[in-house]
Amino acid sequence: MPGLIGKKIGMTSIFSVEGKNLPCTVMEVGPCVVTQVKTVDKDGYEAVQVGFEDKKEKHTTKPERGHFKRAGVSFKRYLAEFKEQGKYKEGDVITVDFFNKGIYVDVVGISKGKGFQGVVKRHGFRGVGEATLGQSDRQRHPGSIGACSYPAKVFKGTRMAGQMGNTKVTIQNLEVIELISKYNLLIVKGSVPGSKGSILIVKK
């Protein structure tokens, strides 16, 4: 089982044994319930599907109700699938104790959406800058986006203004600083994608 579903609580700081002030992120990870076990015979591959956070039946679609009732678990708001070889069975509960203090984890989440942004904020451009001969009101403009008659087009991938943020982001190798099993809290060194309350996938 390589990971669990969690929720970002917020950021804080913790002093290490050496006296360093470490920026940390607090996440509520689990408890997650196994809602489906996939096998090679039936599905063509082996995997485990887990659910996180209960929801009311009135907010659950008819196919979802059948799915959860077959597994004998309560209705879950979030689902995730992890590649795993037949170690778990439907109904098993996996808590934050799945992780250990001192290990390194990868965290996947959706970054904060910034809306439509220009090239200075989105790509770190300097802008056209000084008002030299013929320049006016171009301090934050991108400058040239290509040549003229050849190639007579703008190449794909050219950095321009556009939607910024609200994309899937993975932060790798974050050290687990502390585990608080009583409250299902996992504290890692550094920052993770998303705002407070956003859903995360935490992988070993």
Curated annotation (Swiss-Prot):
- Pfam families, per the entry: Ribosomal_L3
GO annotation, biological process: translation
Molecular function per GO: rRNA binding; structural constituent of ribosome
Query: Which superkingdom heads the taxonomic lineage of this protein's source?
Result: Bacteria
Can you supply one Gene Ontology CC term for this chain's record? cytosolic large ribosomal subunit
UniProt xrefs under InterPro entries: Ribosomal_uL3 (IPR000597), Ribosomal_uL3_bac/org-type (IPR019927), Ribosomal_uL3_CS (IPR019926), Transl_B-barrel_sf (IPR009000)
Q: Per UniProt, which keywords does this protein have?
A: Ribonucleoprotein, Ribosomal protein, RNA-binding, rRNA-binding
Q: Which NCBIfam families match?
A: L3_bact
**HAMAP family on file:** Ribosomal_uL3_B
Function, as annotated, reads: One of the primary rRNA binding proteins, it binds directly near the 3'-end of the 23S rRNA, where it nucleates assembly of the 50S subunit.
- Tell me which family the UniProt entry assigns to this protein: Belongs to the universal ribosomal protein uL3 family.
The subunit structure is: Part of the 50S ribosomal subunit. Forms a cluster with proteins L14 and L19.
Q: What is this protein called?
A: Large ribosomal subunit protein uL3
